[in-house]
């Protein structure tokens, strides 16, 4: 046995013996577990709205506020070009990046539930500090605590959902994380729209309300069951079997339980999971799951739209309230897309959705870039009719992303890793994701200022590259039991060279 996967055809044949029924216990566990996405989503949605509020800018960034009020023609794309302002957004993701390594240890030793609880406490503290902030240092400190919370939550929640779900509906269940993320973004935008009208402390309310999902997640986490996979990994076999019976709704769980035990036995033989992740036999998981997909998910440019939608729409000539309304519409489209993806992932497959959406997103980014090149900048005012067309195009882009790269960027990596490298692999996934999230957050506004419309064409080129990556390197994982995904590499034109003969 290698890679913690089943090493013979008997393992693959055993998958058809798995049984499950949807129980209230299973539904409760998935709903509470997926709430980790609401933390991530609320922050994604609230940051851009707050940084576009005049009261927030006057208190912490008076220079940007004055420049914004002057309506200088040369600052059409550059109104918000300030590295400290972008650090307010990106500091959270740099903190999350660093925290993922501690989160990997907690997730492996104390379970997925332990990381969920730690993440909710840290996120709560960050929300309190940000709401009470008196200076930029307090803002950044609060963001660091929020980042630690997101690092732990993003480490544990996708694993939790993948391990709790039966193979046949794993795609749908795992995408609860994306759905709650999208709902968090939408709620944050609706709150920003209301709090912008509360002077001069509305921004404090927006930031402080981050404590609400943190409290709900903590309270739910106290009664949340640990995953059978994690319990087996900790040597609690009887408890693991009891939980598996409850979440599957049947006593006939011996085949699945045996697979979990065998995978755990292989995992225990691995003393250093991070070093094992670099082993030749794990090269497909490393390249695709740990690095490629999480990096490309951010390089679509989607999070730039989520971070800075209100700021971007204001830069394109929309008023303050109009920009918040436009970004709210955009994020409502993201929620619709997340619901669509819950149905389509297990019906059409992960690979098809990624490829189809890449074509769509490429086209939308090109059209937006060319439109802005011809009609905006250098003192030109953007016609309202054209502005509405841009909002529609961005909504279509969001719909494509929200049913593909958004959920698949978390779902597919969580499916690929064998048990002995799963917590380490997910740690690298979150680390890479947050690194590129922070990089994009820190660089987007300055890139918008210097590249102007070219930033959208740059994202179009990146999307073309990531579509090619999926086409050539990613096999379909739809309805494959999570402990048997490893067997797919043996049938792939490239990856079979890395995994063949490792079990002999």
Swiss-Prot record:
Lineage of source species: Eukaryota, Viridiplantae, Streptophyta, Embryophyta, Tracheophyta
Function: Mediates an active uptake of hexoses, probably by sugar/hydrogen symport.
Intracellular or extracellular location(s): Membrane
Parts of the chain on the Cytoplasmic side: 1-25, 475-504
PANTHER family referenced in this protein's UniProt entry, alphabetically: SOLUTE CARRIER FAMILY 2, FACILITATED GLUCOSE TRANSPORTER, SUGAR TRANSPORT PROTEIN 14
Record keywords, A-Z: Membrane, Sugar transport, Symport, Transmembrane, Transmembrane helix, Transport
Cited CDD domains: MFS_STP
GO cellular component: plasma membrane
UniProt membrane topology term: Multi-pass membrane protein
Family indicated by similarity: Belongs to the major facilitator superfamily. Sugar transporter (TC 2.A.1.1) family.
Cross-referenced SUPFAM superfamilies: MFS general substrate transporter
GO molecular function: monosaccharide transmembrane transporter activity; symporter activity
InterPro entries found in the cross-reference section: MFS_dom, MFS_STP/MST-like_plant, MFS_sugar_transport-like, MFS_trans_sf, STP/PLT_plant, Sugar/inositol_transpt, Sugar_transporter_CS
Transmembrane segments: 26-46, 84-104, 121-141, 144-164, 171-191, 205-225, 286-308, 315-337, 352-372, 382-402, 428-448, 454-474
One Pfam family it belongs to: Sugar_tr
Protein name as it appears in the record: Sugar transport protein 14
């Amino acid at each position: 046995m290698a890679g913690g996967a089943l090493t013979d055809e008997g393992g693959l044949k055993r998958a058809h013996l798995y049984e499950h029924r949807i129980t209230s216990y299973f539904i409760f566990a998935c709903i509470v577990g997926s709430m980790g996405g609401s933390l991530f989503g609320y922050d994604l949605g609230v940051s851009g709205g707050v940084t576009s509020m005049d009261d927030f800018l006057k208190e912490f960034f008076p220079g940007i506020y004055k420049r914004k009020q002057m309506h200088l023609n040369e600052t059409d794309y550059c109104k918000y070009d300030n590295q400290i302002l972008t650090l307010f957004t990106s500091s959270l993701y740099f903190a999350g990046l660093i925290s993922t390594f501690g989160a990997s240890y907690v997730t492996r030793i104390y379970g997925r539930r332990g990381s969920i609880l730690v993440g909710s406490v840290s996120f709560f503290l960050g929300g309190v500090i940000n709401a009470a902030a008196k200076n930029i240092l307090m803002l950044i400190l609060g963001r660091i605590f929020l980042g630690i919370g997101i690092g732990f939550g993003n480490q544990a929640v996708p694993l939790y959902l993948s391990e709790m779900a039966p193979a046949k509906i794993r795609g749908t269940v795992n995408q609860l994380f994306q759905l709650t993320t999208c709902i968090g973004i939408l709620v944050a935008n609706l709150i920003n729209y209301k709090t912008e009208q509360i002077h001069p402390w509305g921004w404090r309310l927006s930031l402080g309300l981050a404590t609400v999902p943190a409290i709900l997640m903590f309270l739910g986490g106290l009664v949340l069951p640990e995953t059978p996979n994690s319990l087996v990994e900790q040597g609690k076999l009887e408890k693991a079997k009891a939980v598996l019976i409850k979440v599957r709704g049947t006593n006939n769980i011996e085949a699945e339980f045996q697979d979990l035990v065998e995978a755990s036995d292989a995992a225990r033989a691995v003393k250093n999971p991070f070093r094992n992740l670099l082993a030749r036999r794990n090269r497909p998981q490393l390249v695709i799951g740990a690095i490629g997909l999480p990096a490309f998910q951010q390089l679509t440019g989607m999070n730039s739209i989520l971070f800075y939608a209100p700021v971007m729409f204001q830069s394109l000539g929309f008023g303050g309230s109009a920009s918040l309304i436009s970004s709210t519409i955009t994020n409502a489209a993201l929620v619709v897309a997340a619901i669509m993806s819950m149905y389509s992932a297990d019906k059409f497959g992960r690979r098809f959705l990624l490829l189809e959406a890449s074509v769509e997103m490429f086209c939308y980014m090109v059209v937006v870039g060319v439109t802005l090149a011809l009609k905006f900048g250098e003192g030109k005012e953007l016609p309202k009719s054209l502005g509405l067309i841009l909002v529609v195009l961005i909504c279509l882009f969001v719909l494509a992303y929200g049913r593909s790269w958004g959920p698949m960027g978390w779902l597919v990596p969580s499916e690929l890793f064998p048990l002995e490298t799963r917590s380490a692999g997910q740690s690298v996934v979150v680390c890479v994701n947050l690194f590129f999230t922070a990089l994009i957050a820190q660089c987007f506004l300055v890139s918008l200022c210097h590249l102007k419309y070219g930033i959208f064409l740059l994202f179009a080129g990146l999307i073309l590259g990531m579509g090619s990556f999926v086409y050539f390197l990613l096999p379909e994982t739809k309805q494959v039991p999570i402990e048997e995904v490893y067997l797919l590499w043996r049938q792939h034109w490239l990856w079979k060279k890395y995994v063949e003969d490792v079990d002999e």
